[in-house]
UniProtKB/Swiss-Prot annotation:
GO terms for molecular function: unfolded protein binding. The keyword Transport applies. One of the proteins required for the normal export of preproteins out of the cell cytoplasm. It is a molecular chaperone that binds to a subset of precursor proteins, maintaining them in a translocation-competent state. It also specifically binds to its receptor SecA. It comes from the Bacteria. It is found in: Cytoplasm. GO terms for biological process: protein folding; protein tetramerization; protein transport. Keywords: Chaperone, Cytoplasm, Protein transport, Translocation, Transport. GO terms for cellular component: cytoplasm. This is Protein-export protein SecB. Its main location: cytoplasm. Homotetramer, a dimer of dimers. One homotetramer interacts with 1 SecA dimer. Gene3D superfamilies: SecB-like. Belongs to the SecB family.
Length: 157
């Protein structure tokens, strides 16, 4: 009975230790002129994630959102938010750990980053900006498929 208990694989563990804003930037380089123009904005959202190992089974995941708003050729505003979290992820195989850090954690961080962006845009006296939800699972799957295709292509050459 003791042998069976010792041979049982450890259960996967996941825990949020902390969520915080790591960096924030807001620029409105063409104010007040842009306030007098017709509001037909072109919004561009760029996202990036970085992962850093902090200790055994402890990771920092940082999600960076860069929102650029243009009116024609002029930049109305540029907003960048780096939202980060410290997570414990233990007893996961490499594939599940990669998914956890590359999709699950950014999915947790996104609402916080979206709220920070909305607040900054509002404080800049611009119309409300609500970023649409992001499917991080699909983005992660696409990224893995792209990596596998590149590896297959490199193996063929």
């Amino acid at each position: 009975m003791t042998e069976a208990a010792n041979s049982t694989p450890a259960q996967p563990e996941f825990q949020i230790q902390r969520i915080y804003v790591k960096d924030v930037s807001f620029e409105a380089p063409n104010t007040p002129v842009v306030f007098q123009k017709e509001w037909q904005p072109e919004i561009k959202l760029d996202m990036d994630t970085q992962t850093q190992v902090l200790g055994q089974d402890v990771y920092e995941v940082a999600l960076t959102l860069t929102v650029t708003c243009k009116l024609g050729e002029e930049t109305a505003f540029l907003c960048e938010v780096k939202q980060a979290g410290i997570f414990t992820a233990a007893n996961l195989d490499a594939q599940n750990l990669a998914h956890c850090l590359g999709a699950f954690c950014p999915n947790i961080l996104f609402p916080y980053a979206r709220e920070t962006v909305a607040g900054l845009v509002s404080r800049g006296s611009f119309p409300q900006l609500n970023l649409a939800p992001v499917n991080f699972d699909a983005l992660f799957a696409s990224h893995i498929a792209q990596l596998e295709a590149e590896q297959a292509k490199a193996g063929v050459q």
